[in-house]
Each structure stands twice: as structure tokens, then as C-alpha cells.
């Protein structure tokens, strides 16, 4: 069984003007697809063939880990975004954010700051720790909370390929627009899991 590029949960132009169709074409259609292709080539004929993406991530290293984690991270990221989304969360997500960060405004400021300061290529995550509290975690390169006991709730991709076409080297501008796309329904499902 080989892995396939999962379908986007929206049209390629649906996130405009915040993320352009051109960015989606390169980021999803080229970068994400390349991770899928590389992973399939790397696991062919190995003990990883036939395992789930999560099993591979938790038990691999090097190129297999990097490509498997990037496939998973990107799929998760696309689901963290939605057209006509953003705003503030409600319900249990809003309550959990307030309990852990004081307010949504404080959380948003801390998450944005962590993502801006995430040096080089990587991901910034909102996770639920094993004690139930929420935390902001930044990972480098293909790092993912799947290798910890934390549950990922939300992520932003801060590799330059995520924003360079639309925002050049202005990561803060990309993050400002990210908040207009956050799919709080997806975050709520992750929190409830």
C-alpha cells in the first residue's frame, strides 16, 4: 500500500486573498506531493511498508521520518485552515484557551510571537498536554507532536515555502493573515479527541 496526496478540503483558490492559489499550487501540489512521493520510494520493500503514517513517524528516523512527518504535518495544516473562517473560538476551545493563556488575545499574541521567532524552517503548534493544559510548541524542520504525549490541536507552517510567494520574507504578514483562516471547528474536534 502506498500513500497518496490527500485531497484538499477546499478549492485551491478558496483561501485567497490570504493564501493565493499559486501558493497552494506550489505548497500543496509540489512540496506536499514530493514528500508523499519520497516517502513511498523510501519505504518500498522495508518494514515500514504497509504501516500507518503515524506508526512510521513514531518508529523511524532520518529521511523516512522527515518525509512521513512532513506528509502528516501538511495534511494536518491544510485542515487547520478554511475559507470564511478565523475569528475567535467558542465553546470548549475558548474555555481551554482562557484557562491556559488568560484570554484569546494573549494566546494569539503568544502563538504569533512563537511562530515569528521559530528560527529557520519548522512548525508552531497549539497542543493539549497529558495534564489537559494547552501549550504552544515550536518544532524545527519536520518535528511533530506525534513523537510526544501531546495532542496537536492547531499548527502553522513556517517553512518559507508556506508564504514566500505571497509575503516574500515577511513572516509576520503571513501570520496576520493566518488568523483569518483558522478552522476552529477542526481545533474543537482535536480537543475533544
Sequence positions of predicted segments:
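Feature for soluble, non-membrane regions of globular proteins
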Residues: 1-193
Amino acid at each position: 500500500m502506498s500513500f497518496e496526496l490527500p485531497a484538499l478540503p477546499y478549492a485551491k483558490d478558496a483561501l485567497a486573498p490570504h493564501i493565493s492559489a499559486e501558493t497552494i499550487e506550489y505548497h500543496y501540489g509540489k512540496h506536499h506531493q514530493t514528500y508523499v512521493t519520497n516517502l513511498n520510494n523510501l519505504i518500498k520493500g522495508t518494514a515500514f511498508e504497509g504501516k500507518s503514517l503515524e506508526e512510521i513517524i513514531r518508529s523511524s528516523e532520518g529521511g523516512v521520518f522527515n518525509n512521513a512527518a512532513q506528509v502528516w504535518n501538511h495534511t494536518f495544516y491544510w485542515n487547520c485552515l478554511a475559507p470564511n473562517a478565523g475569528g475567535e473560538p467558542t465553546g470548549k476551545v475558548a474555555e481551554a484557551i482562557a484557562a491556559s493563556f488568560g484570554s484569546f488575545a494573549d494566546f494569539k499574541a503568544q502563538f504569533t510571537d512563537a511562530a515569528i521567532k521559530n528560527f529557520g524552517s519548522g512548525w508552531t503548534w497549539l497542543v493539549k498536554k497529558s495534564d489537559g493544559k494547552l501549550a504552544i510548541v515550536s518544532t524545527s524542520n519536520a518535528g511533530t507532536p506525534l513523537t510526544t504525549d501531546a495532542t496537536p490541536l492547531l499548527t502553522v507552517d513556517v517553512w518559507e515555502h508556506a508564504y514566500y510567494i505571497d509575503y516574500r520574507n515577511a513572516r509576520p504578514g503571513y501570520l496576520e493573515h493566518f488568523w483569518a483562516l483558522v478552522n476552529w471547528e477542526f481545533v474543537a474536534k482535536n480537543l475533544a479527541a
